[in-house]
């Protein structure tokens, strides 16, 4: 969005704060329904970031696919699971949880040290969507495809990975 600088920064900070609160809610809430609603809040905040970054198509795709479909699927799967099954476990911390936390923390710190040292110049696309063909000669579907393959390649791939993980999680929950 073309917003003045201070308003844009305030919306980014507000979205980041709500995103962090929602992420903590996903991880820390013991009721899976509340956790699923927190996940929906996180996905809406991610969509807000895409809107603020002028990626309207990716933002709408984020809302439709993740909030509209995946989050509803997760909520239905959680609602079909027996409620007493979640309240039986009183052991909140196991060795597997500690190992998983250690692996996640190691992964996050390795990303935090690797990303600033990476030369992003070689990764950037040398062609942009406006250099491929004249915009007036192609229709809207082709423009969307060109933008997805050039300008929005990284967000599109990240969204597809998140979709894959969500589907695997939903299938795993449905099997149990």
Swiss-Prot record:
A Pfam cross-reference name: Oxidored_q3
Gene behind this protein: ndhG
EC code: 7.1.1.-
Protein name listed in UniProt: NAD(P)H-quinone oxidoreductase subunit 6, chloroplastic
InterPro entries (UniProt xref): NAD(P)H-Q_Oxidoreduct_6, NADH_UbQ/plastoQ_OxRdtase_su6, Nuo/plastoQ_OxRdtase_6_NuoJ
Keyword Transmembrane helix tagged: yes
Source species of the chain: Hordeum vulgare (Barley)
Reactions catalysed: a plastoquinone + NADH + (n+1) H(+)(in) = a plastoquinol + NAD(+) + n H(+)(out); a plastoquinone + NADPH + (n+1) H(+)(in) = a plastoquinol + NADP(+) + n H(+)(out)
Chief subcellular location: plastid
């Amino acid at each position: 969005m073309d917003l003045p600088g201070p308003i844009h920064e305030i919306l980014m900070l507000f979205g980041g704060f709500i995103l962090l609160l929602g992420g903590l809610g996903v991880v820390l809430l013991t009721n899976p329904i509340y956790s699923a609603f927190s996940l929906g809040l996180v996905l809406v905040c991610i969509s807000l970031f895409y809107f603020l970054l002028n990626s309207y198509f990716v933002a709408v795709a984020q809302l439709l696919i993740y909030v509209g479909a995946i989050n509803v699927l997760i909520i239905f799967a959680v609602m079909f699971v027996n409620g007493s099954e979640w309240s039986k476990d009183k052991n909140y911390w196991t060795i597997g949880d500690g190992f998983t936390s250690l692996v996640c923390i190691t992964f996050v710190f390795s990303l935090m040290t690797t990303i600033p040292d990476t030369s992003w110049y070689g990764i950037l696309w040398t062609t942009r969507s406006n250099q491929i063909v004249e915009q007036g000669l192609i229709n809207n579907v082709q423009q969307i495809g060109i933008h997805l393959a050039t300008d929005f390649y990284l967000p599109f791939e990240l969204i597809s990975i998140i979709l894959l993980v969500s589907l695997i999680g939903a299938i795993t929950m449905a099997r149990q």
